């Protein structure tokens, strides 16, 4: 893989959130049967169940605004960990919700897939 892990993380994140914000039903090719999503308190495994969960979320319009993006190599095999924080604008809400998301990306030929995906809304105390 010719991309360094920071460039990979930036490219992946831009693609993922652009796809999520325009048509999240098309995210299935980023996951595999062994992939796992933890979305708040729900845990799902497999691309089909993950996409069904994402499509069922109760909003029509969404926009992710990334505040921070950190990446690290996760193994000698080329795995990459990506942590994102940002703001989530849902439907016509004026006040964004804060979120955090972590991706564990695994090399697959000339590309990567999401092995683990952890999403959490961050509420102020």
Swiss-Prot record:
Q: Where is this cross-link: Glycyl lysine isopeptide (Lys-Gly) (interchain with G-Cter in ubiquitin)?
A: 53
Q: What would be an example GO MF term here?
A: nuclear import signal receptor activity
Q: Which of the residues bear the PTM N-acetylserine? A: 2
- Read off the SUPFAM superfamilies from this record: NTF2-like
State the superkingdom: Eukaryota
User: Which residue ranges does the record assign to the NTF2 domain?
Assistant: 8-121
- Cited Gene3D superfamilies: 3.10.450.50
Indicate where this protein resides in the cell.
Cytoplasm
InterPro entries recorded: NTF2, NTF2-like_dom_sf, NTF2_dom, Nuclear_transport_factor_2_euk
Keywords on record: Acetylation, Cytoplasm, Isopeptide bond, Protein transport, Transport, Ubl conjugation
Q: Which GO terms describe its cellular component?
A: cytoplasm; nuclear envelope; nuclear pore central transport channel
Q: Which GO terms describe its biological process?
A: nucleocytoplasmic transport; protein import into nucleus
Biological function: Facilitates protein transport into the nucleus. Interacts with various nucleoporins and with Ran-GDP. Could be part of a multicomponent system of cytosolic factors that assemble at the pore complex during nuclear import. In vitro, the NTF2-Ran-GDP association, in the presence of GTP, triggers dissociation of the karyopherin alpha-beta complex, allowing nuclear translocation of karyopherin alpha and the NLS substrate.
This protein's name:
Nuclear transport factor 2
Which species?
Answer: Saccharomyces cerevisiae (strain ATCC 204508 / S288c)
